[in-house]
Amino acid sequence: MEKLILPRTNAIRAGLSLPTLSDLTDVVTHPPLTQEATAEPFEYPRDNWGSRIALIGPCSLDSPVSETPDWLASIDRPIVLVSTSSERQNDTALVTATIQALRDEPVHVVASVPTGVPAALAAPNTTVRQFISHAAVLERAVCAVTHGGMGVTQKALSHGVPVCAVPYGRDQFEVARRVEVSGSGTRLPSKKMTPNRLRAKINQARSMTAGARRVAEGFRRAGGAARGAELAERLLSRNAHPGPAAAPKSS
């Protein structure tokens, strides 16, 4: 990827009379401020980033939950949320496996399938929809089964809900690893997924609420979008009102 992107990036920079980059990491380490939408303990401890990189935590776009939908209010069991990618990556099997894994468990599965709900997804203790308010469900969830997407995984952890991450590709493998390392849930590679293995990983994750709450507290302390805006405004204000130039030295 670096061989593909770096020459094109440097060509754009040359047209703007900017110095060339020797490494793609320069993209985030050279600017006066880079904001990362995560925070410790979900982010690994770093001691070499300096003040240019700010961990501000997740920036949720969800509206506050004003009232619980009737279908959600009617569920009287602990809820396990399962969510798949909004990109087509053939991960509907995650919903199918979760339904099979928890068919005889005293829980209710709420699944969101943004790419479209297959007709075959049905079970007595299951609600499947194309789109749902994750925030409303997470207020009552005891576990979230995710494809390892950074958005839904951090959203669950922001609510203190432990995660069972089943990654399929790209950054999802790293997100799932962070779930495991932070003690906020479990990881199960999709290629090794069976209903029995998934059930075991979900039940293990359900015992890790304390770890999920630690991550939630770390996110809360980071400040989110409000702190990000404050840092950006501070930088812009400093650049708009630079300090007085040094007086010339007398000869």
Residue ranges and their predicted role:
Residues 1-79, 84-88, 92-107, 121, ...:
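Nucleotide-sugar-dependent glycosyltransferase catalytic domains
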Residues 195-251:
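C-terminal amphipathic helix plus adjacent low-complexity
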Residues 113-132:
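Nucleotide-activated donor-binding/catalytic signature segment of Leloir-type glycosyltransferases, i.e.
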Residues 129-177:
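A donor-sugar binding/catalytic signature common to diverse glycosyltransferases
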Residues 82, 109-111, 165:
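Structural beta-sheet core signal
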Residues 124, 159-160, 180-185:
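Acidic, glycine-centered active-site loop in nucleotide-sugar glycosyltransferases
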Residues 24, 134, 198:
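Acidic, amphipathic alpha-helical patches
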